[in-house]
From Swiss-Prot:
Keywords: Nucleotide-binding. This is Thoeris anti-defense 1. It comes from Clostridium botulinum. 2'cADPR binds at H29, Q53, G55, R57, R78, F82, F87, N92, R109, R113, G120, N122. The gene is tad1. Upon ligand binding the C-terminus changes conformation, enclosing the ligand. Homodimer, the subunits are arranged head-to-tail. Signal peptide: none annotated. It comes from the Bacteria.
Length: 124
């Protein structure tokens, strides 16, 4: 496991670690999110293990899992909810704009791959 170097350095609630080695395309495919505070037995609570898609979706031996846009859609939904509630802020609005922009670019890649009939394959 390797702890990620995150943008937020102070007052972090959680630690994110990546597990394993690089897969196809050079990315890692499993992450753990755990608490930064120990319980009474000296253990850290693990909140979630996230397993990403590993390999092309049409490959028989690929590991099916979460894709990057799934996580961004969750963050987008949360930021939209904060903006509609009592925690609306300029910072959240800017973050929402950039998350939506990231999703737009990721979708543009998907659409391009669909048009070229290579979505779900290891063809570049």
């Amino acid at each position: 496991m390797k702890e990620l170097s995150t943008i937020q350095k102070r007052e972090k609630l959680n630690t994110v670690e990546r597990i394993g080695s690089e897969g196809p395309g050079g990315a890692y495919h499993e992450y753990v999110i755990k608490s930064n505070s120990m319980d009474s037995q000296g253990n850290y609570d693990v909140y979630e293990t996230i397993k990403f898609q590993k390999g092309a979706r049409k490959e028989e031996k690929s590991q099916h899992g979460v894709i990057d846009s799934d996580l961004l859609e969750i963050v987008r939904d949360r930021l939209k909810s904060f903006q509609a509630g009592p925690f609306s802020s300029r910072e959240n609005a800017c973050a929402l704009t950039h998350v939506e922009e990231a999703l737009m670019w990721m979708n543009r890649r998907v659409e391009d791959r669909i048009e070229r009939n290579v979505l779900g394959t290891n063809t570049k």
